[in-house]
Amino acid sequence: MTFAEAIRAGFHTINRRMQLVGVQALLMVVNCIGFFVVVGIPLGIAFVIFGLDLTGLTHATDIFTLFSSPSEFIAKYLWLVLMVVTSILLYLLFVTTLGLYVFSGSAGIIGRSILDPSEPFSIKRFFTEAKQFFFPLMWYTFFISLVFIAIAFVFGLFGGGIGAIVSAAKTQDSTLALFLGIFFSLVLALVAISLLLAIVAATVYGIAVLFFKREGSWKAFKEACVFLWKRQHAFWLYTLLFLGYIVVSFFAMLISYPFHLIPIIGTIVSFPLQLVSYIVQGYLGLVVLAVVFTYYYELEIKKSEADTAEPATDVAPDPAATDEGSTSPEDTSAVPAPEQADALPGQDEKSEG
């Protein structure tokens, strides 16, 4: 399968399941309402009790003045601080859980559409896929988070080592220290970008492994890494999709940004544009997922099924070697009767007598 065929198949899959884009838009609306209810109301109560003028929030000078002495502020309004922090944590938990649930259902519908393209979209099927795929995807997300934390820790160690080398070089020559600082920074940035892109690609292909093979988190990630190592063109396909997603999302956000500079009216006008921008980003994200699922299915699942079916045809019995009747005249002729045996000895004796 070529890149163009995979991308075309991904767009075709999502265009036939446009309800998934509507689910993404509904998720954004629910998140906005949830932020207002869970976080906005406690913050409003806190601002009123703190004596903060809500009309001056655009300048943010009152907020900086309020938090100029954080220890005194926390000691004076401890219960309000705890309430606001708890509200933010609850909101993050709510948004993460709901987003993961919707993503599980969307990934399940996309994978099911690849297995059975004729199956139509239904809300019942969406919730069924979300229920089946939620916990495997949750544990997979937790595992990937640990991987990113480990990578960040390793890069932190390398950054500290580079800082120590540059500091030691400053004592000898400032020009050498400047050169080493720029050189190591560029190398570290290039390695970090390449490694993070590879990890993200393995993560997305791991979701495909998680759906089609129903493996565990570690096995899914490991098989995705092996798949990308054996078929490196799959990595370049995801790189192309990732860059396309970034470019289109940037232009979609750039269209709505100038309206923020217009007072009052700009905020009203920019909100529908932001909604459209979010819908476009959600649509492109689903297309990227569908392309990855399709490419992995065609190269790994479908090809392995074809390979396992070939030996069955190779060992088929030869028709000439089977025990079937022949139609040749020689084989269909009657079997000759055995020649008559000689007379028995007893009969010869009677005839002589």
PLM regions: where:
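Juxtamembrane transition segments at transmembrane-helix termini in multipass membrane proteins
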Residues: 4-9, 15, 25-34, 39-75, ...
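Loop-to-transmembrane-helix entry motif
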Residues: 13-21, 130-137, 141, 145, ...
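Non-cytosolic segments of integral membrane proteins
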Residues: 150-176
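Alpha-helical membrane-spanning segments of integral membrane proteins, especially the hydrophobic core
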Residues: 79, 83-84, 88, 121-149, ...
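Hydrophobic alpha-helical transmembrane segments of multipass integral membrane proteins
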Residues: 30, 34-35, 86-90, 94, ...
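Transmembrane alpha-helix/helix-exit interface in multi-pass inner-membrane proteins
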Residues: 149, 153-160, 197-207
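Residue-level recognition of transmembrane alpha-helices
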Residues: 24-25, 88, 141-142, 238-239
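N-terminal juxtamembrane cytosolic/stromal segments of multi-pass membrane proteins
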Residues: 1-23, 118-130
